[in-house]
Design a protein with these regions (language model features):
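Pyridoxal 5′-phosphate
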Residues: 1-376
Length: 376
């Protein structure tokens, strides 16, 4: 799956230790453990900023998940009926359902960024033309597709969007910790991350980096541990967007995962090597259809395919029950891309997620299993 599992051992150890010895409410007391918890949170913010190449003055906002982060960002913008919102065809419902919710409320227009239907890559020249015809107000795009593994050209799209003063939000859930990124001076205003994916941290923590100077109105309100006599939310970032008790156990796990973060270029190269090996083997199996961007240097370790004569969920069950192999099947919570893949008759795709701990021997078992299933 594109969710990473298992985690580095240090993640489990850090979460267990703090759950037993320091799971207190950060920012809600002056005693030593509360100060230590606050220090851990601030240290983790710094790690995230450094990993993402963000500006020193950028803010890191923690949430319970990337989905909630998308809600905080999109729910914090001031929408108008005249807004023009561009989205990539690769967007997860963590973004798309939120956008659709506000579109129904405000009536703004949503346009898909142009896609080359053959290469399954964004068409930058056509996107620039789209922007000249209908100027973007907001541009939303994933950094990496959780269906095809495609690495989107986020810097190039952001540069074009900024010529029209657009707000640019990137969902980096499948990228941060794997694909190098430098947010500083990129034109990207908000960059979402998920602790449990390519960062190799736990569930229960995600968030976003606010790199630009765009202010968001509070999406959620409540206690922050500061200015408690004031019924309005405190005006300072990131507290204005972080009501409620922080999940210090999950943040401790994320902190440990970030400390254990491997060299991203080396890790990405290893995933590509394994993915290319798997792809070449699958190409030789009759009845296997692959869904990939053409350029292997624009892919991560996600490999999606179908098998003629089977629905995706049927293959998933066979792999699980007969071979003890876990894969994700179906539409992967991505509503727009499948009309380009033309995979509806298969009930979506079968997705293999190659990660940090994948072994060559495991790929051989998978390839053998797919050969046997395809043969019937």
């Amino acid at each position: 799956a594109a969710t990473t599992f298992p985690k580095p051992e240090c993640v489990y150890q850090a979460m267990d230790e703090i759950a037993r010895t320091g799971a207190v409410n950060a920012g809600r007391g002056s005693y030593a453990l509360a100060r230590q918890a606050s220090g851990l949170i601030e240290s983790t913010r710094k790690q995230i900023k450094e990993l993402a190449g963000a500006d020193d003055v950028a803010e890191v906002v923690f949430t319970a998940s990337a989905t909630l982060a998308c809600n905080v960002i999109l729910g914090g913008l001031e929408w108008k009926q005249t807004d023009i919102v561009y989205v990539s065809p690769f967007e997860h419902n963590a973004m798309m359902r939120v956008l659709y919710h506000y579109q129904k409320q405000y009536g703004f227009k949503i346009i898909e960024l142009a896609l080359n239907r053959e290469s399954l890559e964004l068409d930058l020249s056509q996107i620039r033309f789209q922007f000249t015809r209908e100027h973007p107000t907001v541009v939303v795009m994933s950094h990496v597709s959780n269906v095809t593994g495609y690495i989107l050209p986020i810097n190039e799209v952001a540069e074009s969007a900024k010529q029209y003063g657009a707000v640019v939000a990137v969902d980096g859930s499948q990228a941060l910790g794997l694909v190098p990124v430098k947010l500083k001076e990129s034109g990207i205003d908000f960059y979402v991350f998920a602790g449990h994916k390519t960062l190799y941290g736990p569930f229960g923590v995600g968030g976003f980096i606010s790199e630009g100077d765009i202010s968001l109105k509070p999406f959620l309100v409540g206690g922050t541990g500061s200015d408690s006599l004031n019924l309005d939310m405190p005006g300072q970032m990131p507290g204005i967007l972080e009501p409620g008790s922080p999940n210090i156990v999950a943040i401790a796990g994320l902190h440990a995962a970030l400390e254990a973060c491997c060299d991203m270029e080396r890790q990405l190269s290893q995933e590509r090597k394994f993915a290319e090996y798997l792809i070449e083997k699958l190409k030789r199996i009759d009845g296997v259809l692959l869904y990939l961007p053409w350029d292997e240097m624009k892919r991560t370790g996600i490999v999606s395919f179908s098998i003629e004569g089977y629905r995706a969920d049927e293959v998933g069950m066979l792999l699980d029950e007969d071979y003890h192999i876990a894969v994700r099947t179906g539409y992967q919570c991505v509503p727009l891309i499948h009309k380009y893949l033309k995979d509806e008759k298969y009930g979506g795709v079968i997705r293999v997620g190659i990660g940090r701990f994948t072994k060559q021997s495991e790929l051989e078992i998978l390839i053998n299993a797919i050969e046997e299933i395809a043969e019937g």
